[in-house]
Amino acid sequence: MSAFDDIRAPQIELMDDCVHCGFCLPTCPTYVLWGEEMDSPRGRIVLMRQGHEEISAPLVEHIDRCLGCMACVTACPSGVKYDKLIEDTRPQLERNFERPAPERAYRRLVFELFTHPGRLRAAAPLVAAAKRAGVAGIARRPRARRLAPRLASIAGLAPDASPARALKRLPRHFPARGEKRGSVALLQGCVQRVFFGHVNEATACVLAADGFDVHAPRLPRCCGALQLHAGDAGALELARDTIAALEGYDTIVVNAAGCGSAMKDYGHLLRDDPDWEGRAERFAAKVRDATEVLAEAGPRAERRPLPMRVAYHDACHLAHAQGVREPPRELLRQVPGLELIEPAEWEICCGSAGVYNLLDTGAEAVVAANPGCVLQITAHTSRLGRALPVYHPLELVARSIG
């Protein structure tokens, strides 16, 4: 049996901050679902401590089950840095624990496909054909989940991937309207660029309408968030590529919560690289969610009435990982006629099928600032026979501006 190595191992000192008070338990989706101590944040911290001596298969299983929602970080009265602990633990498992061959192949497939926009564009017609053929329904059948559970899960969450939308390119420059208030670079992303390019376009249009000069460079192809959250070493190279591509801009705006949380954490990710540590810290300080930039600046373009009742879902990597809760709400409240409804248990991750609280609001649409949340909520509401459209906040603001 192997144990954690000395390369960025999770720090015992950070583990010692946990006093086992249990405030994290009701906010942890896996603990709420299964009720197992080792599927809670404090239980996983115990396992991390054990990993310094021995990495066992049960340890890996319980760590893998963590959704990385960081709701425990928000709830913890002792300020335990669980986000740093889990980020340092996952790479240890990838280096020091041999996963079964099918699982290794699955993970490699995900990384080699989803972090490459060109490959995603090539796959878009296949995804669209699969959607038309009802693959999502087939994937929910017990036999499919038994034979290929991971692929069945992906099929069930597949986005609407019209080839025309996937192939559309975003203009590289959106000039500010009126007097310029600032200049920003918009991260296009990988999945966001291909399957949610309309969100990138809406983001750029709102920023430009409110006085920002928006640059949308083709590079980087991916910020590395997917691999970072999975503990894959490829995240380091993608982080360096992202810094090199965008560090010349004063502000880097992001409209995908998972990407933003990863990029704001580059300083921690590259802390042991003397050639990149300083650059990473300076870069991370310039990363802002698009809603932060717009809420701080205040509206300039006229907002026209948009009569809708919408429920706002807090994306975990925005609310918990970045601490950004009010800016998206503020932007939505600026839209005349838009009724914003707050769901119960806002802190619970939609990854644990947490959509009932959204349906209970009676809203006619859901608003979420992360593509993963959009896919998850869309899939689950459809599965329950109560399909709701899911928008990024800036899609509705853009529609209001016209």
Language-model segments: residues:
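Cysteine-centered iron-sulfur cluster-binding motifs in ferredoxin-type domains/subunits
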Residues: 12-31, 56, 60-80, 317
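A short glycine/small-residue-enriched secondary-structure motif
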Residues: 40-50, 60-67, 220, 319-321
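Short, intrinsically disordered, charge-biased short linear motifs at domain edges
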Residues: 3-15, 53-55, 60-63, 208-210, ...
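Residue-level recognition of alpha-helix initiation/capping sites
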Residues: 9, 19, 57, 67, ...
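N-terminal glycine-rich anion-binding loops that anchor highly charged ligand groups
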Residues: 22-26, 36-40, 214-216
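Iron-sulfur cluster-binding electron-transfer modules in prokaryotic oxidoreductases
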Residues: 82-402
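Alpha-helix capping and helix-loop boundary segments enriched in small/acidic/polar residues
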Residues: 16, 35-39, 227-233
